[in-house]
Design a protein with these regions (language model features):
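Flexible N-lobe loop architecture of eukaryotic-like protein kinase catalytic domains
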Residues: 72
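Small-side-chain secondary-structure face that scaffolds active or pore-lining regions
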Residues: 200-224, 254-256, 261, 312-318, ...
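Membrane-proximal, glycine/serine-rich, low-complexity loop/turn segments characteristic
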Residues: 1-44, 50, 57, 62-63, ...
């Protein structure tokens, strides 16, 4: 929907982004024209009164949201100090209600596909244009691709790994993926305790292909589970206790190589110099992935995706208790509030990699159809998985927030006053 005064967009398309850099979402409430480049223009996000990140905001189930408000004028944001200078987003989740138990369940299946695909030049034109570029710089240069090779590639009569014509995008990516969402929430309560509880599960998948010879899946899969419990407890007349607790757990499985890098390789790797994979010959016929290359340190896009995988876990939990005491019996319109919130977030990642086997096509016998491969594999090449020390990391952050608030409202005749003090 539309929210007056707020501009937001997301330029990252990674399924199940676990960091704000991967999500790459921006919110602007008060504009950025007066800020210098690189200045912090992010608004303050308060989720049930607790400062939260854009990542936490993105993980709230829509059915859990009660209100979503935007504050941008100076008087409204004054109580938040300098942190509210860029505007404030206030989100409150649903609370319990007195009455019988009311439960709702929801399940969704979503098919996703790219909105746009970039068309690239076909392999034959690529070779012609490459030769033309060489001759433009040096008229005496020898063309890299012979007329015979260009004609044989065009004919399509020979095995695709002898005269490759790779569409790397089709080789790496599927046409679509399937995502799932399930949610359950319960609401109800008595005069003393009202409750709202929900559990939501999301399964998001990417569109990367996995080779059948691999013992592991290279595609992105993220399983996200979120729990939320909100309690309102009437201790006695004029005194309430609010308890909000939420936890989100993400379990991510994906390729060792970033999807952004894979996408970049798909449009920059040569479509004709080597095949994604070569079939076995007399010397290297045992079952394994024989990645094509022309030199030892050349990057094969298919190899970069299939060589390993990454396991990532992110959790975030927020627990808040608020004490509300209505003192209207002492001073009409006076209310005191005190709250404490504890938030913790953790991120863990472990990478597993193989040492891929690399080969180039040494020769091909057009009469017998036999071929020979040249082994360009690095020392210690193996399809056995091992932990990648460069892809192992963990971080944990804990934050405790206290707040004391006094509110006084009064009205006489046609006038109203409101006074708020916050610490």
């Amino acid at each position: 929907g539309k929210i007056a005064g707020m501009v937001g967009w997301q330029t990252g398309g990674l399924p199940a982004a676990l960091t704000e850099d991967e999500m790459n979402t921006k919110f602007y409430i008060r504009g950025i024209t007066s800020f210098q480049t690189g200045a912090n223009v992010d608004p303050l996000i308060l989720l049930d009164g607790v400062e939260s990140s854009k990542l936490d905001l993105a993980r709230i189930a829509p059915e859990d949201i009660e209100t979503f408000s935007v504050m941008k004028d100076a008087s409204a944001t004054a109580m938040y100090g300098a942190r509210g200078a860029n505007g404030v987003i206030l989100v409150t989740t649903k609370k319990g209600q007195e009455g019988s138990v009311y439960a709702t369940a929801r399940y969704e299946t979503v098919f996703s596909m790219p909105t746009k695909r970039i068309d690239v030049v076909d392999p034959v034109d690529y070779m012609k244009m490459y030769n033309r570029a060489l001759l433009t710089r040096d008229p005496l240069a020898t063309p890299k691709y012979s007329v015979e090779r260009i004609n044989r590639t065009r004919s399509g009569k020979y095995p695709s790994w002898v005269y490759p014509a790779n569409d790397w995008y089709k080789i790496l990516f599927k046409n679509y993926n399937v995502n799932h969402h399930a949610g359950l929430n319960i609401r109800g309560g008595s005069k003393v305790i009202q409750y709202y509880a929900s559990v939501n599960y999301n399964r998001d998948q990417g569109m990367l292909k996995t080779d059948k010879l691999n013992d592991f899946d290279c595609n992105i899969t993220n399983n996200q589970t979120a729990f939320r419990v909100n309690l309102t407890i009437d201790l006695k007349a004029g005194i309430k206790l609010l308890i909000n607790s939420s936890t989100t757990i993400d379990k991510y499985h994906g390729p060792l190589t970033s999807v952004n890098q894979a996408y970049e390789l798909a449009f920059n790797a040569s479509p004709v110099d080597f095949a994604p994979l070569y079939p076995g010959d007399e010397n290297y016929g045992w079952p394994h992935l024989r990645f094509g290359t022309t030199e030892a340190n050349q990057e094969n896009p298919y190899m970069m995706i299939q060589k390993g995988y990454l396991e990532r876990t992110r959790y975030s939990t927020t627990n808040r208790a608020e004490y509300i005491h209505n003192l209207s019996g002492l001073v009409k319109g006076l209310e005191l509030r005190g709250s404490v919130a504890v938030s913790q977030a953790g991120y863990y990642t472990t990478g597993f990699t193989t040492n891929p086997f690399k080969y180039s096509l040494l020769n091909y016998d057009f009469e017998t159809g036999k071929h020979r491969l040249q082994d360009l594999s690095p020392f210690g090449a193996s399809y056995a998985l091992s932990i990648d020390p460069t892809a192992k990391a963990s971080t944990t952050e804990t934050r405790v927030t206290y707040e004391a608030r006094a509110l006084h409202t009064a009205a006489w005749k046609e006038h109203q006053t409101s006074l708020t003090g916050v610490f």
